[in-house]
């Protein structure tokens, strides 16, 4: 899933420019300036009397202020590096004796790391002349000292990306993240475990904690037992050295071999556990472009990737991978892969896009970016992949299902303190070095295995580690139940200048469709818009509501009070936009930011569904009246729901008891 600052952190901070400082192959110029003074050391007697002096700390050398003593004069040809030699003017070496600095290319030096002591030619010549003249018998002539070869080890070596280090990315960030996960003491995992069949609308209506904390649906017992075997089989097939069949044939075979699976959660469809990454490529098309994240920098890879190339990389042995990469934003709606990914029915009932965005404006004939396609993601992470701290765009909620592999989540609740720390961190230039977890409270670790599904509510901060190759499906959705948190996260995105690419697409237009949808759904309350003040006052007294209104007929019309309060937040946001659109002083003010906001607000109104500005204003006024009426009825309607639920539960128990009694009588016969 796309993340904000994600990243999601998908919207990652720009790394420091690599052109600001020259690159050295050795770790630091400080290590090359060790003094080898020729002064005679004190005698043994003196050393007993005098305290040992500490070696003075060598000052850091700013290479941008250095001058090369061997650079060719102006007009002279530039030196040509030999085979394997440093080919730029950003690799330096310092003479151990005179402390003069040289470009390696100017002196034809291949690799400065080959020497533990290196002397420039003038120093070597002078030392030879002095030694031959006999004026100094204490020291032999200077000679370069080659480093002894390192002892070879059969251990896998960490591939250090020097270019990444030069750009401000810390060394071994992958190992650092893994160490943080293993070293921290987290809060006990007390998130609720639910059965799949419990993911219903009744859960939201009767559980005050619903959509406030993450919940996990464990894998069915049969799925858990076969998961390791099936995962290994899928990876073996994908990594097999046998040549892959042609794309068209492979696609046909995959379609017949792989059958979408239904989970224990009503309405949810996921790929079968034997699906490999090559199968994904076969299904959606080998030339389909994918955005690949470089885990070390937490930013998009500069190279262009196709899903076929990604499948080859994914199944390359770990020791042969030069970089750790990740795919977290492959949306498959409108592709053949859509048949394998369907959100739970509860998610579709709550999702603003699925419920309120007109169906004819999000079908296959619509252009790719004309509507918010965020419902069906396929995520593919290799061992060691990591997504830094983020909140999904616009504070959207997430459903997340692991097909095979494992994901390790760290969660932090969206408290005022945590969100303030997150906002400050998103604006910081030291995100790569400053782990946000140090500034958050109530961190909880959750490991999600094959066949398990996680529901992440709006605003929860999280980072994700991949301990083994993993295939995941999931999606994002905005709801009526979390508008306050969603709007708060939108404000943070605006304050931290998150690029538009990493924000929830078409959010303003979607808000208009949501308002239009609720105005239509609350239309049965229109009959109360003509009540007199006296009748309205009676209606607001819950004790007399049932006598005035058939409350039972409104249980499917009037939502809970918390939802009505959130609808009012949507109303207020759209009213502010209308006020901005009709402000005549914006154009005269010369404020470019305000002018752009005014234009965006005007273009967001779906005139084909809402009408012009005057009709949009009238629609909001109508919705406001209906919401007010619904709020006056909400308590009575909720009480009616509780009674109906209690009666249904009692009837169900009675039916079950009667069934047991009948079975007992038959058994006695």
UniProtKB/Swiss-Prot annotation:
Zinc finger PHD-type: from-to: 65-126
Keywords for this protein: Chromatin regulator, Dioxygenase, Iron, Metal-binding, Nucleus, Oxidoreductase, Transcription, Transcription regulation, Zinc, Zinc-finger
Catalytic reaction list: N(6),N(6)-dimethyl-L-lysyl(36)-[histone H3] + 2 2-oxoglutarate + 2 O2 = L-lysyl(36)-[histone H3] + 2 formaldehyde + 2 succinate + 2 CO2
Main subcellular location: nucleus
GO biological process terms held by the UniProt record: chromatin remodeling; regulation of transcription by RNA polymerase II
JmjC domain ranges (all copies): 332-494
Comp. bias (Basic residues): 246-255
Ligand binding (Fe cation): 390, 392, 462
Cofactor note: Binds 1 Fe(2+) ion per subunit.
Residues annotated to bind substrate: 407
Keyword Cytoplasm assigned: no
Family annotation (Pfam families): Cupin_8 (PF13621), JHD (PF17811)
Top-level class of the enzyme under EC nomenclature: oxidoreductase
Superkingdom of this protein's organism: Eukaryota
Biased composition (Polar residues): 16-27, 36-49
Localization of this protein: Nucleus
Residue ranges, annotated region (Disordered): 1-61, 131-150, 220-256
Cofactor(s) demanded: Fe(2+)
Listed EC numbers: 1.14.11.27
Similarity annotation: Belongs to the JHDM1 histone demethylase family.
PANTHER family on file: PHD/F-BOX CONTAINING PROTEIN
UniProt function note: Histone demethylase that specifically demethylates 'Lys-36' of histone H3, thereby playing a central role in histone code.
Record's comment describing the protein's domains: The JmjC domain mediates the demethylation activity.
Protein name: JmjC domain-containing histone demethylation protein 1
Organism: Mycosarcoma maydis (Corn smut fungus)
High-level lineage: Eukaryota, Fungi, Dikarya, Basidiomycota, Ustilaginomycotina
Gene designation: JHD1
């Amino acid at each position: 899933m796309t993340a904000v600052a994600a990243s999601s952190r998908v919207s990652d901070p720009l790394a420091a420019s690599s052109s600001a400082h020259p690159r050295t192959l050795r770790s630091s110029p400080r290590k090359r300036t060790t003094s080898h003074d020729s002064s005679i050391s004190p005698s043994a007697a003196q050393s007993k009397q005098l305290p040992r002096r500490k070696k003075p700390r060598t000052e850091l050398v700013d290479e941008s202020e250095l001058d090369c003593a061997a650079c060719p004069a102006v007009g002279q040809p530039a030196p040509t590096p030999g085979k394997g030699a440093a080919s730029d003017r950003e690799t330096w070496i310092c003479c151990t004796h005179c402390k003069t600095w040289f470009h390696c290319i100017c002196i034809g030096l291949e690799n400065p790391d080959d020497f533990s002591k290196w002397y420039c030619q003038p120093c070597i010549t002078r030392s030879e002349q002095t030694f031959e003249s006999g004026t100094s018998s204490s020291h032999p002539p200077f000679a370069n000292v080659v480093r002894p070869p390192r002892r070879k080890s059969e251990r896998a070596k960490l591939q250090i990306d020097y270019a990444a280090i030069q750009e401000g990315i810390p060394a071994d960030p992958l190992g650092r993240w893994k160490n943080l996960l293993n070293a921290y003491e987290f809060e006990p995992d007390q998130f609720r475990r639910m059965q799949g069949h419990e993911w219903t609308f009744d859960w939201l209506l009767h559980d005050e904690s619903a959509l406030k904390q993450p919940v996990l649906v464990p894998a069915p017992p049969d799925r858990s037992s076969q998961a390791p075997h099936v995962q290994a089989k899928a990876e073996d097939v994908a990594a097999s050295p046998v040549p892959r069949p042609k794309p068209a044939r492979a696609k046909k075979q995959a379609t017949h071999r792989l059958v979408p699976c239904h989970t224990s959660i009503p309405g949810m469809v996921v790929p079968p556990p034997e699906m490999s990454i090559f199968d994904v490529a076969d299904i959606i098309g080998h030339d389909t472009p994918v955005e690949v994240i470089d885990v070390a920098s937490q930013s998009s890879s500069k190279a262009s990737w196709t899903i076929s190339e990604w499948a080859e990389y994914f199944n390359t042995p770990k020791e042969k991978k030069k970089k750790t990469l990740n795919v977290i934003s492959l949306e498959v709606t409108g592709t053949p892969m859509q048949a394998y990914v369907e959100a739970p029915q509860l998610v579709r009932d709550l999702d603003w896009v699925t419920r309120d965005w007109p169906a004819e404006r999000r079908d296959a004939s619509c252009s790719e970016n004309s509507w918010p396609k965020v419902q069906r993601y396929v995520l593919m992470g290799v061992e060691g992949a990591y997504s830094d701290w983020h909140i999904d765009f616009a504070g959207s909620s997430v459903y997340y299902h692991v097909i095979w592999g494992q994901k390790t989540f760290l969660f932090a609740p969206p408290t005022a303190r945590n969100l303030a720390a997150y906002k400050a961190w998103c604006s910081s230039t030291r995100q790569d070095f400053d782990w946000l977890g140090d500034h958050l409270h109530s961190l909880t670790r959750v490991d999600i295995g094959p066949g398990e599904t996680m529901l992440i509510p709006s605003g929860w901060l999280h980072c994700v580690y991949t301990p083994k190759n993993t295939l995941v499906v999931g999606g994002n959705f905005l709801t009526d139940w979390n508008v306050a948190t969603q709007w708060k996260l939108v404000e943070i995105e605006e304050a931290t200048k998150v690029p538009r690419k990493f924000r929830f697409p078409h959010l303003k237009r979607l808000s208009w469709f949501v308002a239009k949808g609720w105005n239509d759904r609350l239309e049965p309350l229109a009959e109360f818009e003509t009540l007199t003040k006296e009748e309205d006052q009676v209606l607001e007294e819950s004790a007399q509501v049932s006598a005035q209104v058939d409350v039972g007929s409104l249980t499917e019309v009037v939502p809970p009070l918390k939802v009505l309060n959130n609808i009012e937040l949507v109303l207020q946001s759209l009213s502010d936009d209308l006020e901005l659109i009709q402000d005549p002083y914006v154009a005269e003010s010369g404020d470019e930011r305000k002018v752009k906001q005014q234009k965006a607000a005007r273009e967001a109104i779906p005139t084909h569904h809402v009408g012009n500005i005057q009709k949009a204003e009238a629609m909001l006024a109508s919705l406001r009246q209906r919401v007010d009426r619904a709020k006056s009825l909400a308590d009575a309607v909720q009480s009616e729901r509780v009674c109906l639920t209690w009666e249904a539960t009692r009837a169900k128990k009675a039916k079950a008891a009667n069934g047991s009694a009948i079975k007992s009588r038959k058994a006695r016969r």
